Curated annotation (Swiss-Prot):
<dbReference type="Pfam" id="PF03118">
    <property type="entry name" value="RNA_pol_A_CTD"/>
</dbReference>
<dbReference type="GO" id="GO:0003677">
    <property type="term" value="F:DNA binding"/>
</dbReference>
<dbReference type="InterPro" id="IPR011263">
    <property type="entry name" value="DNA-dir_RNA_pol_RpoA/D/Rpb3"/>
</dbReference>
<dbReference type="InterPro" id="IPR011260">
    <property type="entry name" value="RNAP_asu_C"/>
</dbReference>
<keyword id="KW-0240">DNA-directed RNA polymerase</keyword>
<dbReference type="GO" id="GO:0046983">
    <property type="term" value="F:protein dimerization activity"/>
</dbReference>
<feature type="region of interest" description="Alpha C-terminal domain (alpha-CTD)">
    <location>
        <begin position="250"/>
        <end position="338"/>
    </location>
</feature>
<dbReference type="Pfam" id="PF01000">
    <property type="entry name" value="RNA_pol_A_bac"/>
</dbReference>
<dbReference type="InterPro" id="IPR011773">
    <property type="entry name" value="DNA-dir_RpoA"/>
</dbReference>
<dbReference type="InterPro" id="IPR011262">
    <property type="entry name" value="DNA-dir_RNA_pol_insert"/>
</dbReference>
<dbReference type="Pfam" id="PF01193">
    <property type="entry name" value="RNA_pol_L"/>
</dbReference>
<keyword id="KW-0808">Transferase</keyword>
<feature type="region of interest" description="Alpha N-terminal domain (alpha-NTD)">
    <location>
        <begin position="1"/>
        <end position="234"/>
    </location>
</feature>
<dbReference type="GO" id="GO:0003899">
    <property type="term" value="F:DNA-directed RNA polymerase activity"/>
</dbReference>
<comment type="subunit">
    <text>Homodimer. The RNAP catalytic core consists of 2 alpha, 1 beta, 1 beta' and 1 omega subunit. When a sigma factor is associated with the core the holoenzyme is formed, which can initiate transcription.</text>
</comment>
<keyword id="KW-0804">Transcription</keyword>
<dbReference type="GO" id="GO:0000428">
    <property type="term" value="C:DNA-directed RNA polymerase complex"/>
</dbReference>
């Protein structure tokens, strides 16, 4: 029954996040178990979105006093303007306000000019304050005006030059993505007695403006939103009923005991050992939960899915207010309907 297919696919029960040396910037994110092939599918999709589609902030242009173009040099500054521009690309910024905004650097030598010398304003934070921009000799001074903006992905310098750009404004390639590195690995894993599932391990490094865990969450949300247009049907009804005359808010079949089903001895014993008494108990279990049951394998799972399908039911269903307080009395009352 294809309309129930997605509910029957195995899904990870939880996301494991292992922080790196700097938890705000580096972490390993693990999801398991996944259906075979889903590790590669999800890993590749998440990696591409992480690197290309998350919003961040970057310096988009600079104006330096007494400098007309990027091939100039500044008296008393060891780096030429080209090197200064390259160093400005490496400044990591967190921006919680709409851009563009103007910041500045004013420094006198001798000394090192770092990202920490950039003037901050409300809603803008410099994340790597120790990042070196240039070195000043004795008696040298420098003043720069920076334009910062928000965006996503990579934007070339020529796109950052406004039409009314003043003389001396130098546009800069903007790397907006807060995610610096992403790699993933897919390895086999087991769930219960089944060995052919995928384990997805992602290693994510950010600039500190976003934690790796949050970055993965936002990437997943983007994918979810983009895929929603392809879903052209309504969700099937749950096992809960709302317009009934017998006063029962769920399918009476849920009151049937699982030992009355025509199951193999092995499957029946597994359900009994897991304290699954009624069909209502059974259908709320997911495939992943069932496969964790000792001695319960794929053969038993397929058997149960087939039996439930014949009753118009499936694993992973939602039943409100289950179990009812008077479940034994209700089971006797409706046993003639089984």
């Amino acid at each position: 029954m294809i309309h129930k297919n997605w509910a029957e696919l195995i899904k990870p029960t939880q996301l494991v996040v292992k922080p790196g040396a700097d938890p705000a910037r580096v972490a390993t994110v693990i999801a398991e178990p996944l259906e075979r092939g889903f590790g590669l599918t999800l890993g590749n999709a998440l990696r591409r979105v992480l690197l290309s589609s998350l919003q961040g902030a970057a310096i988009t242009s600079v104006q330096i006093d007494n400098v007309l173009h990027e091939f100039s040099s500044v008296a008393g500054v060891r780096e030429d303007v080209t090197d200064i521009v390259l160093n400005l690309k490496g400044v990591s910024i967190k921006m919680d306000v709409e851009g563009p905004k103007r910041l500045s650097i004013s420094a006198k030598g001798p000394g090192v000019v770092t990202a920490g010398d950039i003037s901050e304003s409300n809603g803008i934070e410099i994340l790597n304050k120790d990042h070196v921009i240039c070195h000043l000799d004795e008696g040298a001074d420098v003043f720069m005006e920076l334009t910062v903006n928000t965006g996503k992905g990579y934007v070339a310098a020529d796109k950052n030059r406004p039409e009314d750009a003043p003389i001396g404004l130098i546009p800069i390639d903007a790397i907006y993505s807060p995610v610096k590195k992403v790699s993933y690995e897919v390895t086999p894993t087991r769930e219960g007695q089944v060995l052919d599932y995928d384990k997805l391990t992602m290693r994510v490094e950010t600039d500190g403006g976003l934690t790796p865990e949050d970055a993965v969450a936002y990437a997943a949300r983007i994918l979810q939103d983009q895929l929603s247009i392809f879903v052209n049907f309504e969700e099937p009804e749950s096992a809960t009923r709302h317009d009934v005359e017998d006063g029962l808010e769920f399918n009476p079949l849920l009151l049937k005991k699982v030992d009355e089903l025509e199951l193999s001895v092995r499957s029946a014993n597994c359900l009994k050992n897991d304290n699954i008494v009624y069909i209502g108990d059974l259908i709320q279990k997911t495939e992943a939960e069932m496969l964790r049951t000792p001695n319960f394998g794929r053969k038993s799972l397929n058997e149960i899915k087939e039996v439930l399908s014949g009753m118009g039911l499936h694993l992973g269903m939602d039943v409100e207010d289950w179990p009812p307080e008077n479940i034994e009395d209700l089971a006797k009352r409706f046993e003639d309907q089984f």
